[in-house]
Structures are given as C-alpha cells and as structure tokens.
C-alpha cells in the first residue's frame, strides 16, 4: 500500500507544481513500469517472463523507451501537469 500511496502523491505533486509554476516552468513526470535494468540481474528469465505476463502488453520496458518518453514531455511545449504512464498497460488493470 505504501508504494501505491507514494505513486499517487508523486502524480498529485506533479499537477500541483505545474499549476504553481506556470507559465514560466512546465512540470511533467514519467511513470515507468517494469524497466529491465541491472536491478533485475538476480531474477531468472522465468521470473521476468512471469512478471511480463501480468501486464496487458506482456512485455517489459527498455531504458531507452523511458528516455524517449521524457524527451517527448520536454519537446511538447503545450504539455504540463501530466504523468506519462509507460507501464505496458499496467494501469489498465
């Protein structure tokens, strides 16, 4: 439950900061799902596949995809207060 509350707080903080700092500063966030990094090195391929299967898109996210999402938020001058979920559909569940 603590993780869910902290994630909700981060999303709300993004919106509050965007409102408070506009129009001079835009505030957005990226909320990635299962990003395969060295942190997952201890997991077996079977464990990773089980995790991937729990997402609607049944895949993990590459670090480069998170970077691409961040670049999109930076480039889009009309976007502020948004949290871009890059989670292979996890929030759909």
Regions found by a protein language model. Name each.
Residues 3, 11:
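Catalytic tyrosine of NAD(P)H-dependent dehydrogenase/reductases that use a Tyr as the general acid/base
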Residues 6, 14:
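Active-site helix of classical SDR
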Residues 18-23:
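Alpha-helical segment proximal to the catalytic Tyr-Lys
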Residues 26-28:
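Structural signature of beta-strand start/N-cap positions in the alpha/beta core
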Residues 31-42:
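Short, flexible catalytic-loop segment of classical short-chain dehydrogenase/reductase
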Residues 46-65:
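Catalytic Tyr-x(3-8)-Lys segment
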Residues 62-86, 91:
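C-terminal substrate-recognition "lid" of short-chain dehydrogenase/reductases
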């Amino acid at each position: 439950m603590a993780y869910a509350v902290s994630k909700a707080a981060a999303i709300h903080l993004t919106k509050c900061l965007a409102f408070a700092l506009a129009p001079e500063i835009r505030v957005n966030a990226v909320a990635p799902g299962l990003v395969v990094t060295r942190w997952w090195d201890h997991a077996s391929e079977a464990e990773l596949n089980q995790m991937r299967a729990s997402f609607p898109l049944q895949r993990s996210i590459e670090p480069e995809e998170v970077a691409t999402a961040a670049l999109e938020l930076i480039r889009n001058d009309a976007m502020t207060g948004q949290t871009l979920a890059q989670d292979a559909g996890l929030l759909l569940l």
